[in-house]
Amino acid sequence: MRGSLDWNMENQKSYALITGASSGMGLEYARQMAAKGYNILVVSNRDEDNVKVAESLKAEFGVDAQPFYADLSKTEASQAVFDWTVEKGYRVDVLISNAGLLVFNKLENIPAAKMDLIIGVHCLATAHLCRLFGSQMKERAVALSRQRTEEAIAAGAKPGSRKAKRAGKLRKGECGRILIMSSLAAYLPYPTISIYSATKAFSKAFGTAIWVELRDWGISVTTVCPSAVDTPLIGLKPSLRKLAHNLGVMIYPQTLVKKALRAMFHGKRIVVPTLLAKIAVGFCSILPMHCVSWIAHIPVIKKNVYDAV
C-alpha cells in the first residue's frame, strides 16, 4: 500500500486524526485528545474553522495541530486525507471517525443528493479511512512483532517456541486505536431518520467486524453508540434541550467524549455511554416495530434539521 511506514521512523510525529473536528463533538474530541498530549489532525469541510481550531489547540495545549480540508462525502476525499498524512510524515496512531450529519424528515422528502451525502460520510468515508489507516497500522504492527520475535530468538528462544511467540504478541491498542461514532439509532430503525439509522447500523456492524480483524495486531477498534448528544446537529429550542437533559435523553458532548475515550484507551469494542441508553438497547431488541410509529408524530421530528460535516 502507498505510504507504508516503518515502525521506528523517528522523524515522524504521532498524531490523532479526527474527522468533523471543526465543531461539535469532533471539536470536543480534539480538545480532550490534545489535553492528553496528542498532536491533532483537524479534518472537516470547513476550511476556515479548521485553521481556527488548529491554532487554538496549539495555543491552549502546546501540541502540534494541522488542518486539512476534506469533503468526506466525495469518494476520493479519504485517499486525499491519507496521502496528505504520508506526504507530511504524520504518523496516525489514533483515528477518530466522527464526521456526521442528520436530517429529520420522511424519506420521500429527502433530496437524493442529501441521501448520498449522509451515506458517503457515514459509510464510505468511515470504511475507506479505516481501510487506509488500519492497514498502515497493521504494517507497523507486523514489523514490530517480527522485530521482537527476532530479538527473542537472538537471545536464545527457539524459532516457533512459545517464548518466541509470546515475544511477538502485541498488546491491545499498542499499534493503533480506531474510534467509530455510531448511535443508539443503530439498534432501532427510527422513523424520520431512516437513512441516518441505517448508516449508523452499518457503522456499528463494520466496527465490530474490523475489531475482530485487527485485535491480534495490537489495534483496538471502539464503536460508540450514544443517545442524543447536545450539539448543533440537533436543532432543539433551549427549553427542550433542558428537558431532554433532565430526562436523561440527551448527554453533553464533554461527558460523552470523556466516556468514549476512556473506553477506547481500555480497548473496549462497544460503548453505550449512559444508563438510559443501555436500557433502551435492551428494549430495542424486543420492541415490536408498530410500537414506534408514534415517533414520526413528535413535533420536533417533523422539522427538517441538518448540519454540515
Where do the PLM segments sit?
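Substrate-binding pocket helix/loop in short-chain dehydrogenase/reductase
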Residues: 106-107, 111-119
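Active-site helix of classical SDR
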Residues: 130, 199
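Conserved glycine-rich Rossmann-like NAD(P)H-binding loop of the short-chain dehydrogenase/reductase
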Residues: 36-52
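Conserved glycine-rich cofactor-binding loop
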Residues: 15, 22-23
